[in-house]
Amino acid sequence: MDNLQIALSYLKKGVSVMPVWSPSMVERRQPAAFMKRLAEAKAKNGASDNPLPEQDVVRKALINQCKAPVLYAWKEYQERLPTVEEVTQWFTDNPDANIGVITGKVSNLVVFDLDSAHASQFAEEQGGFPLTIMAKTGKGYHAYMRHPGFVIKNSVNKKLDIDIRADGGYVVAPPSLHGSGYSYQWVEGQSIYELDPAECTHWMMEYLQDIATPTTEKQKPERKEQKATHT
Protein backbone atom coordinates (compact mmCIF):
# COMPACT_ATOMS: atom_id res chain seq x y z
CA MET A 1 0.00 0.00 0.00
CA ASP A 2 1.13 3.55 -0.60
CA ASN A 3 0.92 6.20 2.11
CA LEU A 4 -2.49 7.41 0.94
CA GLN A 5 -3.96 3.92 1.26
CA ILE A 6 -2.28 3.45 4.64
CA ALA A 7 -3.54 6.80 5.93
CA LEU A 8 -7.06 5.90 4.80
CA SER A 9 -6.78 2.52 6.52
CA TYR A 10 -5.89 4.28 9.78
CA LEU A 11 -8.82 6.64 9.30
CA LYS A 12 -11.08 3.63 8.83
CA LYS A 13 -9.89 2.42 12.25
CA GLY A 14 -11.25 5.64 13.76
CA VAL A 15 -7.93 7.46 13.94
CA SER A 16 -7.48 11.12 13.01
CA VAL A 17 -4.57 11.44 10.57
CA MET A 18 -2.69 14.20 8.78
CA PRO A 19 0.38 14.57 6.55
CA VAL A 20 3.77 15.26 8.16
CA TRP A 21 6.96 16.37 6.42
CA SER A 22 9.21 13.57 5.17
CA PRO A 23 12.93 13.72 4.24
CA SER A 24 12.20 13.60 0.51
CA MET A 25 9.63 16.41 0.80
CA VAL A 26 12.10 18.62 2.67
CA GLU A 27 14.84 17.94 0.14
CA ARG A 28 12.55 18.64 -2.79
CA ARG A 29 10.72 21.71 -1.47
CA GLN A 30 13.21 23.21 1.00
CA PRO A 31 10.48 24.95 3.03
CA ALA A 32 11.30 28.49 4.12
CA ALA A 33 10.81 27.76 7.83
CA PHE A 34 13.23 24.85 7.66
CA MET A 35 15.85 26.82 5.73
CA LYS A 36 15.63 29.67 8.25
CA ARG A 37 16.06 27.36 11.24
CA LEU A 38 18.92 25.58 9.49
CA ALA A 39 20.72 28.87 8.80
CA GLU A 40 20.28 29.89 12.45
CA ALA A 41 21.55 26.51 13.64
CA LYS A 42 24.61 26.73 11.39
CA ALA A 43 25.38 30.25 12.62
CA LYS A 44 25.05 29.22 16.26
CA ASN A 45 27.19 26.15 15.67
CA GLY A 46 29.82 28.23 13.91
CA ALA A 47 30.08 30.53 16.91
CA SER A 48 30.43 27.64 19.33
CA ASP A 49 33.75 26.81 20.99
CA ASN A 50 33.06 23.15 20.19
CA PRO A 51 31.24 23.16 16.84
CA LEU A 52 29.64 20.00 15.52
CA PRO A 53 30.33 18.71 12.01
CA GLU A 54 28.00 20.53 9.61
CA GLN A 55 26.38 17.26 8.56
CA ASP A 56 25.27 16.72 12.17
CA VAL A 57 23.70 20.18 12.28
CA VAL A 58 21.82 19.50 9.04
CA ARG A 59 20.76 16.06 10.28
CA LYS A 60 19.32 17.45 13.51
CA ALA A 61 17.39 20.15 11.64
CA LEU A 62 16.02 17.56 9.22
CA ILE A 63 14.94 15.28 12.07
CA ASN A 64 12.98 18.13 13.66
CA GLN A 65 11.36 19.14 10.36
CA CYS A 66 10.28 15.56 9.68
CA LYS A 67 8.10 15.70 12.79
CA ALA A 68 6.28 18.86 11.69
CA PRO A 69 2.75 18.87 10.20
CA VAL A 70 2.39 19.81 6.55
CA LEU A 71 -0.92 21.50 7.34
CA TYR A 72 -0.69 25.10 8.52
CA ALA A 73 -3.76 24.57 10.70
CA TRP A 74 -4.80 21.20 12.09
CA LYS A 75 -6.59 22.11 15.33
CA GLU A 76 -10.00 21.12 13.94
CA TYR A 77 -8.72 17.58 13.39
CA GLN A 78 -8.09 17.39 17.13
CA GLU A 79 -11.87 17.68 17.46
CA ARG A 80 -13.13 15.69 14.47
CA LEU A 81 -11.90 13.02 12.09
CA PRO A 82 -10.91 14.26 8.66
CA THR A 83 -13.07 13.10 5.79
CA VAL A 84 -11.96 10.54 3.25
CA GLU A 85 -11.92 13.35 0.70
CA GLU A 86 -9.63 15.50 2.85
CA VAL A 87 -7.15 12.70 3.49
CA THR A 88 -7.20 11.74 -0.18
CA GLN A 89 -6.46 15.32 -1.21
CA TRP A 90 -3.63 15.72 1.30
CA PHE A 91 -1.80 12.57 0.30
CA THR A 92 -2.48 13.02 -3.40
CA ASP A 93 -0.83 16.43 -3.19
CA ASN A 94 1.92 14.99 -0.97
CA PRO A 95 2.27 11.30 -1.92
CA ASP A 96 5.56 10.89 -0.03
CA ALA A 97 4.38 12.63 3.15
CA ASN A 98 4.85 10.94 6.49
CA ILE A 99 1.71 9.95 8.37
CA GLY A 100 0.80 11.73 11.57
CA VAL A 101 -1.66 10.17 14.01
CA ILE A 102 -3.47 12.79 16.07
CA THR A 103 -3.81 11.63 19.65
CA GLY A 104 -6.37 12.51 22.30
CA LYS A 105 -10.09 11.93 22.61
CA VAL A 106 -10.67 12.37 18.87
CA SER A 107 -8.79 9.12 18.19
CA ASN A 108 -9.40 7.60 21.63
CA LEU A 109 -5.62 7.40 22.03
CA VAL A 110 -2.89 8.38 24.44
CA VAL A 111 0.63 7.42 23.40
CA PHE A 112 3.51 6.72 25.76
CA ASP A 113 6.70 7.68 23.90
CA LEU A 114 9.66 5.83 25.41
CA ASP A 115 12.87 7.38 24.12
CA SER A 116 15.55 5.21 25.71
CA ALA A 117 16.41 1.90 27.32
CA HIS A 118 16.16 3.73 30.65
CA ALA A 119 12.54 4.64 29.88
CA SER A 120 11.73 1.06 28.91
CA GLN A 121 13.33 -0.22 32.11
CA PHE A 122 11.26 2.21 34.19
CA ALA A 123 8.07 1.04 32.49
CA GLU A 124 8.96 -2.60 33.11
CA GLU A 125 9.65 -1.89 36.78
CA GLN A 126 6.18 -0.37 37.07
CA GLY A 127 4.56 -3.45 35.57
CA GLY A 128 5.17 -2.97 31.86
CA PHE A 129 2.58 -2.56 29.14
CA PRO A 130 -0.34 -4.89 28.43
CA LEU A 131 -0.67 -6.33 24.94
CA THR A 132 -1.41 -3.23 22.91
CA ILE A 133 -0.53 -1.42 19.69
CA MET A 134 3.20 -0.75 19.69
CA ALA A 135 5.53 0.92 17.19
CA LYS A 136 9.32 0.94 17.02
CA THR A 137 10.96 4.36 16.87
CA GLY A 138 14.59 5.35 16.49
CA LYS A 139 15.27 5.39 20.22
CA GLY A 140 12.52 3.22 21.63
CA TYR A 141 8.80 2.63 21.31
CA HIS A 142 5.40 4.25 20.99
CA ALA A 143 2.81 2.45 23.12
CA TYR A 144 -0.71 3.25 21.91
CA MET A 145 -3.17 3.11 24.82
CA ARG A 146 -6.90 3.75 25.07
CA HIS A 147 -7.66 7.31 26.14
CA PRO A 148 -8.86 7.26 29.79
CA GLY A 149 -11.50 9.94 29.26
CA PHE A 150 -10.12 12.91 31.18
CA VAL A 151 -8.15 15.75 29.59
CA ILE A 152 -4.46 14.91 29.26
CA LYS A 153 -1.97 17.48 28.07
CA ASN A 154 1.17 16.56 26.19
CA SER A 155 4.21 16.30 28.42
CA VAL A 156 7.95 15.75 28.27
CA ASN A 157 9.84 14.02 31.06
CA LYS A 158 13.55 14.43 30.34
CA LYS A 159 14.54 12.59 33.51
CA LEU A 160 12.68 9.42 32.54
CA ASP A 161 12.80 9.91 28.75
CA ILE A 162 9.05 9.35 28.60
CA ASP A 163 6.87 11.74 26.62
CA ILE A 164 3.09 11.67 26.58
CA ARG A 165 1.12 12.53 23.47
CA ALA A 166 -2.57 13.00 24.12
CA ASP A 167 -5.07 15.86 23.71
CA GLY A 168 -3.70 18.40 21.25
CA GLY A 169 -0.81 16.18 20.24
CA TYR A 170 0.25 13.69 17.59
CA VAL A 171 2.87 11.07 16.80
CA VAL A 172 4.54 10.05 13.56
CA ALA A 173 3.26 6.60 12.63
CA PRO A 174 4.57 3.67 10.56
CA PRO A 175 5.72 3.37 7.85
CA SER A 176 6.93 7.00 7.97
CA LEU A 177 10.60 7.84 7.46
CA HIS A 178 12.54 9.53 10.25
CA GLY A 179 14.87 12.39 9.39
CA SER A 180 17.83 10.16 10.24
CA GLY A 181 16.79 7.64 7.61
CA TYR A 182 15.16 4.82 9.57
CA SER A 183 11.49 3.95 9.22
CA TYR A 184 8.90 3.68 11.95
CA GLN A 185 7.64 0.09 12.14
CA TRP A 186 4.90 -1.75 13.97
CA VAL A 187 6.13 -4.30 16.47
CA GLU A 188 5.43 -7.76 15.08
CA GLY A 189 1.97 -8.91 16.11
CA GLN A 190 1.15 -5.50 17.64
CA SER A 191 0.16 -3.36 14.68
CA ILE A 192 -2.89 -1.13 14.46
CA TYR A 193 -4.43 -3.78 12.19
CA GLU A 194 -4.00 -6.62 14.68
CA LEU A 195 -4.89 -5.04 18.02
CA ASP A 196 -7.05 -2.39 19.60
CA PRO A 197 -5.43 -0.02 22.10
CA ALA A 198 -5.47 -1.57 25.56
CA GLU A 199 -6.78 0.20 28.64
CA CYS A 200 -4.21 2.01 30.76
CA THR A 201 -3.05 -0.03 33.73
CA HIS A 202 -2.86 1.28 37.29
CA TRP A 203 0.63 2.75 37.03
CA MET A 204 -0.17 4.43 33.73
CA MET A 205 -3.36 5.95 35.13
CA GLU A 206 -1.42 7.35 38.08
CA TYR A 207 1.20 8.76 35.72
CA LEU A 208 -1.46 10.42 33.54
CA GLN A 209 -3.48 11.72 36.47
CA ASP A 210 -0.37 13.36 37.87
CA ILE A 211 0.13 15.13 34.54
CA ALA A 212 -3.52 16.15 34.37
CA THR A 213 -3.59 17.65 37.87
CA PRO A 214 -2.60 21.34 37.88
CA THR A 215 0.27 22.13 40.21
CA THR A 216 -1.91 24.50 42.23
CA GLU A 217 -4.32 21.67 42.96
CA LYS A 218 -1.69 19.24 44.16
CA GLN A 219 -1.31 18.99 47.91
CA LYS A 220 1.45 21.26 49.10
CA PRO A 221 3.83 19.98 51.78
CA GLU A 222 3.27 21.42 55.22
CA ARG A 223 5.67 24.12 56.28
CA LYS A 224 7.93 23.13 59.14
CA GLU A 225 7.10 26.27 61.07
CA GLN A 226 3.36 25.58 60.92
CA LYS A 227 1.81 25.50 64.39
CA ALA A 228 0.39 22.26 65.67
CA THR A 229 -3.37 21.85 65.46
CA HIS A 230 -5.12 21.91 68.81
CA THR A 231 -7.56 19.11 69.56
Language-model segment annotations:
Residues 225-231:
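Disulfide-bonded cysteine-rich modules in secreted/extracellular proteins
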Residues 1-225:
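Conserved phosphate/metal-binding and DNA-contacting active-site motifs used
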